Swiss-Prot record:
GO terms for molecular function: toxin activity. Contains 3 disulfide bonds. GO terms for cellular component: extracellular region. Residues 1-24 form the signal peptide. Disulfide bonds: none annotated. Keywords: Disulfide bond, Secreted, Signal, Toxin. It is found in: Secreted. Coiled coil: none annotated. This is U-scoloptoxin(10)-Er1a. Expressed by the venom gland. It comes from the Eukaryota. It comes from Ethmostigmus rubripes (Giant centipede).
Length: 84
């Protein structure tokens, strides 16, 4: 019984990671981990861009969401943009 449970959990993790790879969804933590590997200057630049993006989105009512990967505001109807 416990082997079946472990197999089921492992299969769930595999499906989850495959889904993340296929859809291209990455979390803020994933982005920061990659930035840390590239060096402190790159990480600082990414954090600065995300902060600028948050500020810009707050200033314009028609833009409410911020895309972490590209430091620009996205229209509300753009599905791949997400809140930061």
């Amino acid at each position: 019984m416990s082997r079946f449970c472990l197999l089921f959990v492992a299969f769930g993790f595999v499906l989850y990671f495959l889904h993340m790879e296929v859809t291209g969804k990455r979390t803020r933590e994933d982005i920061l981990k990659e930035a840390e590997q590239k060096g402190p200057e790159i990480k600082a630049m990414i954090l600065e861009n995300v902060q600028k993006c948050k500020t810009n989105c707050a200033l314009h009512l028609k833009y409410e969401k911020c895309n972490e990967l590209v430091p620009e505001c996205c229209p509300k109807e753009t599905p791949k943009c997400k809140s930061v």
